[in-house]
Curated annotation (Swiss-Prot):
PANTHER family documented for this protein: ENDO-1,4-BETA-GLUCANASE
Signal sequence annotation: 1-29
Family to which this protein belongs: Belongs to the glycosyl hydrolase 9 (cellulase E) family.
Swiss-Prot/TrEMBL catalytic activity: Endohydrolysis of (1->4)-beta-D-glucosidic linkages in cellulose, lichenin and cereal beta-D-glucans
Cysteines paired by S-S bonds: none
The protein, known as: Cellulase 1
Keywords assigned by UniProt, alphabetized: Carbohydrate metabolism, Cellulose degradation, Glycosidase, Hydrolase, Polysaccharide degradation, Signal
Active-site residues, record numbering mapped to chain: D342 (nucleophile), H669, D717, E726
UniProt KW Hydrolase keyword: yes
Role noted for this protein: This endoglucanase acts only on crystalline cellulose.
Region: Catalytic, residue numbers: 212-746
EC number(s) given by UniProt: 3.2.1.4
Encoding gene, per UniProt annotation: cel1
Protein source organism: Streptomyces reticuli
Length: 746
């Protein structure tokens, strides 16, 4: 998900009253204190409070916090009018305790006015003894309206919070962030297939070949060889060697690679290694569902109340109005998936995510190595399991029903178009469970891009659900036809790039690719000449659409091209379509071969894009598709090497998939998978893909740690880093598709 800001200070925290207003100290080149009266020697002024009873106790500010609140910011203590200077480094420190122990304080430095940005936050678990806490960050903006706040709500029971020695010191030396990259031998930390490629990367200063050994779980060397020096890798700035141990065909668990005095993280060699990830990557979607209670018996540790069913404090989603001036009706837009780390629901991202899940299933029907039963009925532990419909189709239908609801009703202006998105009026804070979201919900204007996403996915659904539910398939096809005609009538209704308050803009100024994709899906489902003609006449049809950064929600031509190549049809010139996919795969294969980390991804200028992890995987999808078209093992092997990257063979030596690998991402930016901020909440479920390196590092936390980063190092596993570490439904769809392909190769 793309966004510009995430609000994490709320109006509630501003309701307290400051008793005095003291002069503001300006930050300077030397260390300068920005907090006034952080020692509470004789008074609590100018600190304000909200929903606590506070006073002095032994030279500390102590507050009695009521129980029964929901959110951290429901009770708070803070100080406003803090001056911060852009580019200045600050040390935020304090002593704090809690009675009884085990309660959490959310300590934040941010903006006291809209949009309530947060620049530093931490959520320590307090003990009854004073604990000392210190954090360093760099201010991303100039402001005289900063705020230091201690948010102490969200507890069922009453407790006592005490704080002292609060300091925000400007002019301190910036901390140098050094990620712990572990052993210098980088491997796929999950597994390699016995008959598949097996490659690793060694980070070393050596320029000559070095010996390596493959050891089994007992420490016995089972294979050996010499590394291949590759020089300095541009994507990481590291001097590296390659290791190829693909000739070893044994099976087992707990293997390690040893080279240059380093021992890799352990991994397996197992034909069934990817089967759990195939399931977990799709199970992810159940816990993303809106409008339904998540059952703890189906997802232990992730049970929660239904979100956005018009039960207070929710204000949606059963009768959601439009933004002012957009429409005069309301729509029932319950259901669907929450898009990413927020509570928004977006047609364009929902569209590409649904397409990729449906295509994962469709591949199982058409590919020589496909296994339809692998995601069949009963495999995903869903509420719908047991209904004789493949579980992957049950899950995708939850989103499809929402997409259909976003269509403008007949008789209304722009009938047949699809609203672009639905989300909160303002940004909300973290953590926040879906059923506790208090914000007003709004429909945003219909767009051509959203309408064509609906047309494409509904048309695809019509052919795939027909064997299981003819009525739904017919309804989907009718909606797709209606959307297509509406898009033809309104070909240039574009999303406002500035419409990014409360949710991502998802703006797209070129919908030629969406027209092509929708026409392709409608043709593949109906076989009608009108849609074939649009496909063949489109400039997209013969264009080189497979760029270095792959495809995503804003670049959907590949969705149409891949399906035209893979799904049987009588399209004239289909052989040329298939050859274009194979040609693209050859390009990605050349990129992979040249890359010291074996990635089918080399963005221009080494500028890693937002959500780069899923772009690597989608380039792998093209390689996998070429394998399905040709049967050539080189394409299968290339696709599998893309999985190596996301599962640990990378510069940071970590798996970007939660729960998979010795070291994996687990603090993704999310309002309810927020264990880092609230120990009572879970981390993301196993099988959740992190966005991955992003050279633009748009969020303040990443900027404070990663400024000047090189390619693969532009990532940090922290919940505050929404630009490098969010989770999103379209990203996980790429993982699901590739995990399913990999599992089929075992």
């Amino acid at each position: 998900m793309k966004r510009r800001t995430t609000a994490v200070l709320t109006l509630t925290a501003l309701l307290g009253t400051a008793l005095t207003a003291l002069p503001v100290q300006q930050a300077g080149a030397e260390e300068v204190e920005q907090v006034r009266n952080g020692t509470f020697d004789t008074t609590t002024d100018p600190w304000w409070t909200s929903n606590v009873t506070a006073g002095l106790s032994d030279g500390r500010l102590c507050a009695d916090v009521p129980g029964g609140t929901t959110n951290r910011w429901d009770s708070a203590i803070g100080q406003n009018d803090i001056t911060l200077v852009k580019g200045e480094t600050y040390r935020f420190s304090f002593h704090a305790s809690g009675i009884p122990e085990g309660h959490v304080v959310r300590a934040v430095v941010g903006l006291a006015v809209s949009p309530y940005d947060t620049w530093q936050e931490a959520s320590p678990v307090l003990t009854e003894a004073d604990g000392s806490y210190s954090y360093t960050f760099t201010a991303p903006v100039d402001t005289t309206q900063g705020q230091v706040a201690f948010q102490v709500g969200g507890s069922t029971d009453a407790w006592r919070f005490c704080v002292d020695d609060v300091s925000l010191l400007g002019g301190v030396p910036p901390e140098v962030y050094e990620p712990d990259t572990g052993p210098r031998v980088r491997v796929n930390q999950v597994a390699y297939l016995p008959a598949g490629p097996k490659n690793a990367t060694l980070v070393t200063d050596a320029t000559a070949r070095l010996p390596w050994q493959l050891r089994n779980a007992q420490g016995t060397t089972v294979a050996r060889g010499l590394t291949v020096p590759r020089g300095v890798d541009a994507s990481s700035g590291q001097n590296v060697h390659s290791i190829d141990f693909g000739s070893y065909r044994g099976r087992g668990t707990g293997y390690t690679l040893v080279a240059d005095g380093e021992t890799s993280h352990p991994f397996d060699i197992d034909a069934a290694a990817y089967r759990p990830l195939r399931l977990d990557s799709v199970k992810y979607y159940y816990t993303q569902r809106s409008g339904i209670a998540i059952r703890d018996d189906l997802r232990p540790g992730y049970g929660r109340a239904a979100g956005h069913l018009n039960v207070a404090p929710n204000q949606g989603d059963a009768n959601v109005p439009c933004q002012p001036g957009v429409c005069d009706y309301t729509l029932d837009v319950t259901g669907g998936w929450y898009d990413a780390g927020d509570h928004g629901k977006y047609v364009v991202n929902g569209g590409i995510a649904t397409w990729e899940l449906l295509s994962t299933y469709e591949r199982s029907l058409t590919a020589r190595t496909g296994h339809p039963a692998a995601l069949g009925d009963g495999t995903l532990a869903l509420p719908e399991s047991g209904n004789k419909v493949p579980d992957v189709l049950d899950e995708a239908r939850w989103e499809l029903e929402f997409l259909l609801k976003m269509q403008v009703p007949a008789g209304q202006p722009l009938a047949g178009m699809a609203h672009h998105k639905l989300h909160d009026e303002q940004w909300t804070g973290l953590p926040l469970l879906p059923d506790q979201d208090p914000q007003k919900r709004e429909l945003h204007p219909p767009t051509t891009a959203a309408t064509l996403n609906l047309a494409a996915t509904a048309a695809q659904a019509a052919r795939l659900y027909r064997p299981f539910d003819k009525a739904f398939a017919a309804r989907a096809l009718t909606a797709a036809r209606t959307a297509w005609q509406a898009a033809l009538a309104h070909p240039d209704l574009l999303a406002d790039p500035n419409d990014g308050t409360g949710g991502g803009a998802y703006n797209d100024d070129d919908v030629t690719d969406e027209f092509y994709w929708a026409a392709a899906e409608l043709y593949l489902t109906t076989g009608e000449r009108q849609f074939a003609d649009h496909v063949l006449d489109s400039p997209v049809h013969t264009a080189d659409i497979f760029g270095p950064t792959g495809f995503d929600w804003g670049h959907t031509a590949a969705a149409g091209r891949l399906d035209l190549a893979l799904v049987p049809s009588r399209l004239p010139g289909r052989d040329q379509v298939r050859r274009s996919v194979i040609k693209a795969a050859d390009t990605y294969l050349a990129t992979l071969t040249a890359h010291p980390y074996g990635m089918p991804y080399a963005p221009a200028g080494n500028r890693y894009d937002w959500g780069s992890s899923h772009q690597v995987l989608n380039n792998g999808v093209v390689l996998a598709s070429a394998y399905d078209l040709t049967g050539a093992a080189k394409y299968r092997d290339g696709a599998l090497q893309g999985m190596d990257y996301v599962l640990g063979r990378n510069a940071l030596n970590m798996s970007y998939v939660t729960g998979y690998g010795e070291v994996s991402s687990h603090n993704q930016h999310s309002r309810w998978y927020a264990h880092q901020l609230d120990p009572t909440l879970p981390n993301p479920p196993s099988g959740t893909l992190a966005g991955g390196p992003n050279s633009s590092i748009q969020d303040p936390y990443a900027q404070s740690k990663l400024t000047g980063c090189v390619g693969q190092f532009c990532y940090i596993d922290d919940i505050q880093s929404w630009s490098t570490n969010e989770t999103a439904i379209n990203w996980n769809a790429a993982l699901a598709r590739m995990a399913s392909f990999a599992a089929d190769q075992g």
